[in-house]
Amino acid sequence: MPSQKSPTKRSPTKRSPTKRSPQKGGKGGKGAKRGGKAGKRRRGVQVKRRRRRRESYGIYIYKVLKQVHPDTGISSRAMSVMNSFVNDVFERIAAEAGRLTTYNRRSTVSSREVQTAVRLLLPGELAKHAVSEGTKAVTKYTTSR
């Protein structure tokens, strides 16, 4: 005689996730289901994981764009290219400033090393403008403190 399983009752300790009413606006929005890893379970209830923040220079690139060309927009792909460019230049300047600090047997990167790194990395007139803008920014920062 084959054994039949009887329907098991749920134990009171395990809870099912609470049912929510559907959101306005149909698909999409904040409450839309996203792919990826599921959250951890705590006492039988699914715990929602916080999404990791993606840092970007996007807002600053946009502010500069609006200062230079107020009526011009930027696509997300162009923004991605600009973000990669800023990251690349930042890494190059930081690496060069670090090397200069090591050559001078110092342990702290100062504004002088950063300025020299900019002069070494950027060509001619671009380096002059970058140095003057950097000096202006450092002066503004020190006077505001």
Swiss-Prot record:
The lineage of its organism: Eukaryota, Metazoa, Echinodermata, Eleutherozoa, Echinozoa. Belongs to the histone H2B family. It comes from Parechinus angulosus. This is Histone H2B.1, sperm. Monoubiquitination of Lys-140 gives a specific tag for epigenetic transcriptional activation and is also prerequisite for histone H3 'Lys-4' and 'Lys-79' methylation. Phosphorylated on SPKK motifs 3 and 4; which may regulate DNA binding. Dephosphorylated during maturation of spermatids to mature sperm and rephosphorylated at fertilization. PANTHER family: HISTONE H2B. InterPro entries: Histone-fold, Histone_H2A/H2B/H3, Histone_H2B, HISTONE_H2B_site. GO terms for molecular function: DNA binding; protein heterodimerization activity; structural constituent of chromatin. There is a cross-link at K140 (Glycyl lysine isopeptide (Lys-Gly) (interchain with G-Cter in ubiquitin)). Keywords: Chromosome, DNA-binding, Glycoprotein, Isopeptide bond, Nucleosome core, Nucleus, Phosphoprotein, Ubl conjugation. Residues 7-22, 30-52 have a biased composition (Basic residues). A motif (SPKK motif 2) lies at residues 11-14. Core component of nucleosome. Nucleosomes wrap and compact DNA into chromatin, limiting DNA accessibility to the cellular machineries which require DNA as a template. Histones thereby play a central role in transcription regulation, DNA repair, DNA replication and chromosomal stability. DNA accessibility is regulated via a complex set of post-translational modifications of histones, also called histone code, and nucleosome remodeling.
